[in-house]
Amino acid sequence: MRGFKIFSGSAHTLFSNEVAKCLDISLSKTTINRFSDGEINVQIGESVRGKDIFIIQPTCAPANDHLMELLIMTDALKRSGAKNINAVIPYFGYARQDRKVVPRVPITAKLVANLIEQSGIHRVITMDLHAEQIQGFFDIPVDNLYGSIVFRDYLKTKSFKNPIVASPDIGGVARARHFADRIGMDLVIVDKKRERANESEVMNIIGDVDGKDVILIDDMIDTAGTMCKAADVLKSRGANSVIALGTHPVLSGPALERIAKSALDEVVVTNSIPLRVAHPKIKVLSVAPLFAEVIRRICHNESVNSLFF
């Protein structure tokens, strides 16, 4: 194995420590402070000369701070003689701004890709990009893992009598179909009409859910409006139970309250983002072992293809 070190930003140190533990190493030392005006100051606490470096930093809220911290850490490591710098970004912020949908708006996902690449990062390891084409915004290797691998294993522990996979909207059909095909289930679609940003209105169910145990799947749960309204409609159409699988628990604004009041029986997420508070309906699955295995294989010059579910 090549000599490597793992550093953690401040976004999710619990996750970083879990990844390091899976690899039987300790996180390398770094100090992250702020100047009196709020600017971020980073100091690397040990030699990295000639080493392969992995920085673990999801760019979740506050996205601007965590992204800037990642870039500054990268610059510090590059100037300290690191050989290769790999950014492990379990949740890739700004991924929803991947194209122009109205005039005179930015493509921020491309801008962020440019910033990451120009900072000196040689490889990005992420999971469930909101838009997979973002991989093409980079001219460096991007490994986009899938949370569905841990969801599949979790579903094996459930005793569903008549399960079926559902996409909460038309945009997620490809993701839901891929998951349904891999686990051998049929697919239904919840069609919705979006009234305004972060608000959704469920309109119709395409498929039969009467007496079924419905498994909603999406890449993220933000305000939870889509998932909760979908669950309510599915139950009204005769669904026996409804659980939601969402890789990234953004859970902003009224999300937790909506989940509590909704017809959702369970919400299953990963620890790609730190959960704000515990919630009786929310189950968190760890993807730290998955990321640790990717790091191990990269350091051994092994293929990571089998880890893409």
Swiss-Prot record:
Its cofactor is Mg(2+). ATP binds at residues 37-39, 96-97. The keyword Transferase applies. One of its GO terms (biological process) is purine nucleotide biosynthetic process. The keyword Metal-binding applies. Binds 2 Mg(2+) ions per subunit. It is an enzyme of class 2 (transferase). It is found in: Cytoplasm. GO terms for molecular function: ATP binding; kinase activity; magnesium ion binding; ribose phosphate diphosphokinase activity. Pathway: Metabolic intermediate biosynthesis; 5-phospho-alpha-D-ribose 1-diphosphate biosynthesis; 5-phospho-alpha-D-ribose 1-diphosphate from D-ribose 5-phosphate (route I): step 1/1. This is Ribose-phosphate pyrophosphokinase.
